[in-house]
């Protein structure tokens, strides 16, 4: 296919035009007075959102060169969302500001490589300053403040997230689901829950809700299938002597082994229940090891030289409470706290080393089941459109809150970026080249843009207020929702440090790519043949009658 090629100024101008269009669509959502964006869907009702990354994801431009610029900027929003969970609009505004100011300098003949070096130098100093300025958050109230701001100043959502995080801990899993009612509620699952139910309803001890409820029970954790009752007899006899219930977890239990267990359960000879192992493949073995650690038992595996016939009562796990229904099993643990902590640290290390988002998610779930449990926020709303928008906000707020717990918080509303710009003013740049100094200055000017946009969305002129902030004492900022000068931290207007830092670093990265682009290549669209010509071609041998 033939290609269209733009060089030099033409390439950069076209890319910047696309960046500007996407930035204009996204920046209107910034701040407490940010506006909604309505997104058409081919099927169903349109989506209403104030989420920058949701707007960015939807944008495709007709001009292929402009579209390339827009897609680069979209990458800023998506990457920031993936890393920090919020700050996508801030990142977009910063990236456009750095690219716009940088391209002015490139157009005047300044070497873009030198400009990029200066930008990188300033951003590295700024990122370190943000890290140093961060204040650790510890209280439930501070967590609620962060969550409320990220949920577009919805204090109810903020309180629900803080409540969930307080219950399950910072390593616990909090999931967001759609509620079947109009209300937003939280439900909790203590201990370890996994999606495996009983192998036979005849195991149930509560006939009303068809569930198995055991207290102070033993757990046999076996890696392979069990098909013969003879293999199980030795361990069953040992458990029978203790008069305690037994939960059997194995790859599968079939044949006369399952039949004998059901018969014993129905007759009341032994309180027993059998379930299949959770997970698949390598993950199955890891989850069985988690259950063993959680319950203080041993995974009975031939690799370790252990067989069913030789199992001792000390090798069985123990649980305070076990609940099994047709779909799920919940185990409330009594395991060794030290062993659980060691296992948790191992999983945290695996999360850090993993490059797959799917693997990270599964490891995080395993960690939560070990240390705290799972909280589910059920989001309710009156209409489907409102439900989608609200669920987006809750997910954003949850991600931002996790980022805040991880790296701490800084004053919000763009005031931290202004303070960082003032800090960069104090840096000695005499050893930098002329081009690098220009790049350094570009970052300083661009750091004002997010606050300027927040104030603009509130209906005021940003430049006046930015000048005033620079002369006020540290920590003061403009509250765009109440139109007052306030101490940002004391007023609860805070941003996660990780969000602010990631937004700046990702913005500078993509802006640097735009500045150093000298050529852009895209496919030439083929014109579709619109000439008539329906019907069959005439046979050349056929003449007119």
Swiss-Prot record:
Give the Gene Ontology MF terms in alphabetical order.
Answer: ATP binding; ATP-dependent protein folding chaperone; isomerase activity; unfolded protein binding
Chief subcellular location? cytoplasm
Record flagged with keyword Acetylation: no
**Which InterPro entries does the protein's record reference?**
Chaperonin_Cpn60_CS, Cpn60/GroEL, Cpn60/GroEL/TCP-1, GroEL-like_apical_dom_sf, GROEL-like_equatorial_sf, TCP-1-like_intermed_sf
User: Which biological process, per GO, is one annotated for this protein?
Assistant: protein refolding
Alphabetized, the UniProt keywords read:
ATP-binding, Chaperone, Cytoplasm, Isomerase, Nucleotide-binding
Statement: the UniProt record of this protein carries the keyword Amino-acid biosynthesis: no
Q: What enzyme category does the UniProt record give?
A: isomerase
| Chain sites annotated for binding ATP | 29-32, 50, 86-90, 413, 495
Provide the reaction this enzyme catalyses. Answer: ATP + H2O + a folded polypeptide = ADP + phosphate + an unfolded polypeptide
Q: Which domain of life is it from?
A: Bacteria
- Location of the protein in the cell: Cytoplasm
PROSITE patterns associated with the record: CHAPERONINS_CPN60 (PS00296)
Q: Name one GO cellular component term.
A: cytosol
Write the Enzyme Commission number(s) for this entry. 5.6.1.7
Show the PANTHER family listed in the entry.
60 KDA HEAT SHOCK PROTEIN, MITOCHONDRIAL
Oligomeric state and interaction partners are given as:
Forms a cylinder of 14 subunits composed of two heptameric rings stacked back-to-back. Interacts with the co-chaperonin GroES.
The free-text function statement in the UniProt record for this protein reads:
Together with its co-chaperonin GroES, plays an essential role in assisting protein folding. The GroEL-GroES system forms a nano-cage that allows encapsulation of the non-native substrate proteins and provides a physical environment optimized to promote and accelerate protein folding.
Family membership: Belongs to the chaperonin (HSP60) family.
Question: What NCBIfam families does the entry give?
Answer: GroEL, PRK00013.1, PRK12849.1, PRK12850.1, PRK12851.1
Name of this protein: Chaperonin GroEL
**Organism source for this protein?**
Borreliella burgdorferi (strain ATCC 35210 / DSM 4680 / CIP 102532 / B31)
Q: Coding gene?
A: groEL
